[in-house]
């Protein structure tokens, strides 16, 4: 349970939970920390569904959805996850490329390619069990390295008094601010928080635990790790704003590591950060490989390792291209999260609550919600992203009305 507890924690605190979060805090202050703090909110909700999830003998989220809604819905959900999760792996490779280029110079795209190649090779060399075992060490490295970075950065920026004097008051507003309204928080809880509750990478960790008790302890350990890490990265982001106000937001943490820390400490923190990116990338690649292997190719025999490893290679190559040509860590992740959550959150939650939709209704909610969220992100209109959840809720309400009418007639 201890190993599996470190595993989802290390998975969550990847490129978005470090460089991405530091960049958000650098840009708007304390409210940027919600990017990671919505994680414990979603994980707390997951605790209530562990018994239901552990009672099902499945390997992947699309397989679970297919059991509820039929094979067509399982395939559609698998396709949505594959498309969305390319952005997540791509973001990890981009984050690794940024910190390596900051540390050692050179073009970021080449470092992104190199890091992505290492991530893919690492994932291909082992399976879910191998990743779970190493993720515990990675979680400890992440927490230790980020804690050191936060302490040194805070000292160099003059302590809490220096932050208060050097940053505008809006940077200390919480839970909302002039740059981050209540509606922004609600949308982040829906789009990002829901992936912690029903996301395929988190659920793959649940499916990998031996029992409901092990899964519960793993989730609780993850919550206890994520909250202090969010605090460390927040302090680092605000300190970087004082020390290096002219740099790009997502360069805040790499610059702090390079300029503020002694060389030995900077190297240790760089290793911790790269381990965070590796943790997120390997879990996501394994999730995508399992979906391709089990849900699309029907290969469940654990002895046939060639197909899963080739799936990791193919997904990894595509994700590296996304990382090289993406516009940033947070934007690419939000695109993926929005498509996934907008299409699948309502059907999954309804089934977990014991009120599943009819198969045709679930398919309509997934397709319409996913398309609405995709249109919203591509057009830059958050109202459409929020509307994807409204579409899912409307389909659910209509389905329940039809169900009740049919039952009354019978």
Where do the protein language model's features map onto the residues?
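Membrane-embedded helix-loop-helix hairpins and adjacent transmembrane boundary segments
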Residues: 1-410
């Amino acid at each position: 349970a201890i190993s599996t507890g470190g595993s989802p924690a290390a998975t969550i605190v990847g490129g978005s939970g470090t460089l991405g979060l530091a960049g958000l805090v650098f840009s708007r202050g304390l409210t940027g920390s919600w990017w990671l703090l919505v994680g414990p909110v979603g994980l707390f909700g997951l605790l209530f569904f562990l018994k239901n999830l552990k009672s099902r003998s499945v390997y992947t989220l699309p397989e679970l959805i297919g059991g509820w809604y039929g094979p067509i819905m399982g395939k559609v959900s698998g396709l949505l996850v594959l498309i969305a999760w390319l952005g997540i792996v791509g973001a990890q490779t981009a984050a690794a490329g940024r910190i390596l280029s900051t540390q050692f110079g050179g073009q970021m795209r080449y470092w992104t390619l190199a890091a992505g190649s290492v991530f893919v090779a690492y994932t291909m060399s082992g399976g879910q069990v191998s990743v779970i075992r190493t993720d515990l060490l990675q979680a400890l490295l992440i927490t230790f390295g980020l804690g050191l970075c936060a302490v040194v950065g805070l000292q160099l920026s003059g302590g809490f008094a220096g932050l208060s004097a050097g940053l505008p008051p809006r940077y200390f507003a919480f839970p909302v601010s002039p740059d981050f309204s209540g509606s922004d928080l609600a949308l982040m809880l829906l789009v990002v928080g829901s992936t912690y509750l029903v996301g395929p990478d988190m659920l793959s960790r649940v499916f990998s635990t031996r029992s409901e008790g092990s899964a519960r302890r793993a989730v609780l350990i993850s919550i206890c790790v994520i909250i202090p890490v969010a605090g460390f990265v927040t302090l680092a982001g605000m300190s970087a704003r004082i020390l290096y106000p002219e740099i790009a937001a997502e360069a805040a943490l790499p610059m702090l590591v390079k300029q503020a820390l002694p060389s030995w400490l900077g190297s240790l923190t760089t290793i911790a950060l790269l381990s965070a990116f590796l943790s997120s990338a390997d879990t996501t690649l394994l999730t995508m490989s399992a979906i391709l292997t089990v849900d699309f190719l029907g290969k469940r025999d654990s002895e046939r390792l060639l197909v899963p490893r080739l799936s990791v290679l193919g997904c990894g190559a595509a994700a590296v291209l996304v990382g090289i040509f993406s516009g940033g860590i947070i934007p690419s992740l939000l695109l993926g999260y929005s498509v996934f959550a907008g299409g699948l959150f309502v059907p999954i939650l309804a089934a977990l609550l014991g009120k599943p939709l009819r198969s045709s209704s679930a398919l309509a909610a997934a397709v319409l919600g996913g398309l609405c969220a995709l249109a919203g992100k591509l057009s830059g209109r958050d109202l459409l992203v929020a509307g994807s959840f409204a579409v899912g809720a409307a389909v659910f309400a209509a389905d329940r009305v039809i169900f009740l009418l049919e039952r009354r007639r019978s």
